[in-house]
Amino acid sequence: FAMAQAKKREACSLLCLPFTITKQVLNLALSIALLILSTLLGPFKQPAINFLENNRGLVILFFCLPASFIFDLAIKARIYVQRRFLDPDSTHSARVNEIRDRVKEWGKVPASDRKPLCTARPNWLSLSTTFFDKTKCHQIPIDLHEILRFDEKNLILHAEPNVTVREVVEYLVPRGYTLAVCLEVGDATLGGLAFGVGMTTYSHKVGLYQETISEYEVVTANGEVITVRADNSHSDLFYCLPWSHGTLGLLVSLKLQVVPAKKYVHLKYITANSQDEYCKMMMKYSGANDKEEKVADFLEGTIFSKDKAVIMLGSFAEKKEKPDVKVWSQVNDVCLWYKPWFYKHVESILNAGSNHEELVPLESYLLRHNRAIFWVLESMIPFGNHPVFRLFFGWLCPPKPAFLKFTTTPLIREWTFAKQVFQDIVLPLDTLKEQVDEATRLFDRWPLLVYPCRIYDHKRGPQGQLRAPPSSRVTPGTNFAMFNDLGVYGTPGQLEKKLPYNPTQAMRDMEKFTRDVGGYSFLYADLFMNEEEFEQMFDLTLYKKVRKQYHCNGAFPTLYEKIRPEVDVIAIGEQYAKKSN
């Protein structure tokens, strides 16, 4: 067996050689370019750097987009080779057993010499903004990329953790189904969402991504392979795995809830012209006030200014069910490369001053924000929504998050939190007005994303890192309260207006507001709170019990260790604040 595994790894190295070469060539090209610039420019070095910083759209257009395209092809080729040619007889059980055996081998090392466990998945393949230092850990390869089974009768998809959202969409939609919670970013993985968090426009009906997971298959710190469900002996672990970020075990498969779907989504765009109006609309259309409210399948709000917003209601639709010729003449595939970015399309409806209806193909609806990475791409390529750019270069968008992380330098890493903001925050929906006011004061960045979402009280005492919602916020006659994701992305308005901006103060104020109203920060983004403040925001009571029960202490980093920024964001933020004054 050992010899077979050695041959397998050797074959893998040979077959993945093109990917390795591509990676090295890109690194070398970047290093040479920087060296040439540094040598030739001499006294003009700093002005040149300033020019590149102020015109980064050109850099992305002529370097990042083509290189990202090649890079993505190399990654896809590597995965394709692994799936199709490396070991055609490989089974899920065999792959899991190999991971289990690696963990058991690690367990034989004297405790004093052991490093904590983590996956060997490179940092640049994750969608987080941070770079956890994996060199301090014992890395376990998790080469699990397969959809294992679709149980059409019980509407359950069984898949391995590295399957991406795009792959699932392409698999399920032609069959007439979709995930109950399907993230809009195609490169997100099912496992990353399971051990992190996911929320979409269907979440006002079913809750967070974790609520749609019926079963986890996990390799524990002592090398056991266990099935984790809410109704078996591992129920405590079941409720702690979400938001754990790989600090309680290694995920090797999961089972997800699937819902029947139709070919189209019938979208209604409703404009709002005051803050009170859109706040009341979100409460009503989400069913937060009344459990009998007939809610749409999809609900989303895009807030373009303090008093202007568009609320989108979406319902599954087929042509035969909607004979309205006017509506069916407006089928809009919003993901075509030459079309306006989705949020710009929404903004045009707001500017027109009237409500609008149209049909969007289901797959395009599910990935509608992928091309512009919501609206982050505008900060990278200010001219990216220009019709000429879309026509000739739109098919290259977006630059792959993996490539952007892969080419991140220390300076660019600082910019991700000092000159930009990437935050998703779970907050009680009845505080939406206060959320918008605070985000405006701190970041002055538009638009803002709002997805309503149920947070459940599972009636079991401690229920993982998220507390049960207070009874005062629970929708009468139910076991859930309506929260929402507030998404803030892009360059703070203060910096665009050349005004003083302190990223440290802004982020710490936002985190304090979140704690005060009983909310939670998504942990993919940089945190500025200390460990004590972190434990005020999240309930780690059950988490700590589970870590002890499953021998995680010493075997995996703690949650705070895993997700805290690898750089001193507070000190760096203060330095940038002084520069902006």
Question: In which residue ranges do the predicted regions lie?
Answer:
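Extended C-terminal subregions enriched in glycine
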Residues: I425-W446, N484-D485, Y489-F522
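C-terminal substrate-binding/cap subdomain adjacent to the FAD-binding core in PCMH-type
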Residues: A4, K8-L30, G42, I49-E53, ...
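Activity-critical C-terminal alpha-helical subdomain
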Residues: N55-F62, P66-R78, L404-P410, S471, ...
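Glycine-rich N-terminal segment of FAD-binding domains in flavoprotein oxidoreductases
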Residues: L86-D187, G191-Y202, V450
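Eukaryotic N-terminal low-complexity, Ser/Thr- and Lys/Arg-rich leader segments
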Residues: F1-S112, T558-N581
